[in-house]
Amino acid sequence: MTAMNSNFSYPALGVDGISSQISPIRDVWSTNLQQEMNLIMSLIERYPVVSMDTEFPGVVARPLGVFKSSDDYHYQTLRANVDSLKIIQIGLALSDEEGNAPVEACTWQFNFTFNLQDDMYAPESIELLTKSGIDFKKHQEVGIEPADFAELLIGSGLVLQEEVTWITFHSGYDFAYLLKAMTQIPLPAEYEEFYKILCIYFPKNYDIKYIMKSVLNNSKGLQDIADDLQIHRIGPQHQAGSDALLTARIFFEIRSRYFDGSIDSRMLNQLYGLGSTGSVLWHNNSSTPQIQFRDLPGAHPSPTPSNAGIPTTLTNTSSAPNFANSTFRFPPRVV
């Protein structure tokens, strides 16, 4: 990428003297999905940098057994949860390689169908999202079907294109939910296969958290990094559109401030918390591999399809909101 120019800006942000008459974040439901995807398709060639965030219903399951490494455990935790849960929001923010956003629109927040009566979730996650302004009644009534979104996304020019760069923050779960929607099958049994598929659909991607930790030894969350850089958030925290827009602005700021306008290619296609190899075996409370679900109120997990490759032995745990007896957990994503 080229260095960010001096005119870096996002339209209508409502801060630093920029007009706020038009919101930069466009809500997308089933009723306007085709219209908004058409707009994105008309812009992607000129604005081929896509910053992305998702909101999902928490973490409700963990694998038990023997694992090749801690990274293997982290991936199996991700896999068990993504295969069992439904996405709630996806946020996408477009810009060009200098960080300029389109005038027509710059950020889209896709809202997916979700039913609090039928779909599984972690209660504390839903409570947080509700406090952040997510309208679950509307999600139930006019939310987007993931398959409909995926069909349009595959043909949009955003994925399967080496010319498009994806920017994320602690993005293992984000990409996993997108891949699940596009492939319509459970995630691969092994991380190596997941990574191969990831690089087909998203051949060029940067994870800001990986970059900050690897180069600057900074493991702060998205909001804390924004505060350090004095970047103002637009929209509510813990909503995908706002987080995607903030991700975009942080990326171009750190690229300019710390990397002289060009990030080392070694940072490309690395996911924070996943991917390093190791031969040591990791144990987690059981000699028999299985998936352990939290004992949640309301909806309960359905057995994983046999072709998923995930062990389908389910065990109830206590109703406590954490896995106190778990040796490892996927690093919590802090925003």
Swiss-Prot record:
As stated in the Swiss-Prot or TrEMBL entry, residues carrying the post-translational modification Phosphoserine are: 302, 306
GO annotations of cellular component type: CCR4-NOT complex; CCR4-NOT core complex; cytosol; nucleus; P-body
Species this protein is from: Schizosaccharomyces pombe (strain 972 / ATCC 24843) (Fission yeast)
| Alphabetical UniProt keywords | Activator, Cytoplasm, Exonuclease, Hydrolase, Magnesium, Manganese, Metal-binding, Nuclease, Nucleus, Phosphoprotein, Repressor, RNA-binding, Transcription, Transcription regulation, Zinc
- Pfam families attached here? CAF1
This chain's function reads:
Acts as the catalytic component of the CCR4-NOT core complex, which in the nucleus seems to be a general transcription factor, and in the cytoplasm the major mRNA deadenylase involved in mRNA turnover. In vivo and in vitro, caf1 has 3'-exoribonuclease activity with a preference for poly(A) RNAs.
Task: Quote the Gene3D superfamilies the UniProt record gives.
Answer: Ribonuclease H-like superfamily/Ribonuclease H
Polar residues compositional bias: what residue ranges? 305-325
Reaction catalysed by this enzyme:
Exonucleolytic cleavage of poly(A) to 5'-AMP
Residue(s) carrying Phosphothreonine: 304
EC assignment: 3.1.13.4
Record family assignment: Belongs to the CAF1 family.
Q: Spell out the protein name for this chain.
A: Poly(A) ribonuclease pop2
Annotated localization: Cytoplasm; Nucleus
Residues annotated as binding Mg(2+) are 53, 55, 174, 243
Binding, Zn(2+):
53, 55, 243
- The source's superkingdom equals Eukaryota
The record, for InterPro entries, names: CNOT7/CNOT8/Pop2 (IPR039637), RNase_CAF1 (IPR006941), RNaseH-like_sf (IPR012337), RNaseH_sf (IPR036397)
Query: Which GO BP terms sit in this record?
Result: nuclear-transcribed mRNA catabolic process, deadenylation-dependent decay; nuclear-transcribed mRNA poly(A) tail shortening; regulatory ncRNA-mediated gene silencing
Annotated cofactor note:
Binds 1 Mn(2+) ion per subunit. Binds 1 Zn(2+) ion per subunit. At lower physiological Zn(2+) concentrations, Mg(2+) replaces Zn(2+). The nature of the bound ion affects the speed of the RNA degradation reaction and, to a limited extent, base selectivity.
Cofactor(s), by name = Mn(2+); Zn(2+); Mg(2+)
Gene name of the record: caf1
Q: Which GO terms describe its molecular function?
A: chromatin binding; manganese ion binding; metal ion binding; mRNA binding; poly(A)-specific ribonuclease activity; RNA nuclease activity; zinc ion binding
Q: Where is this region: Disordered?
A: 292-325
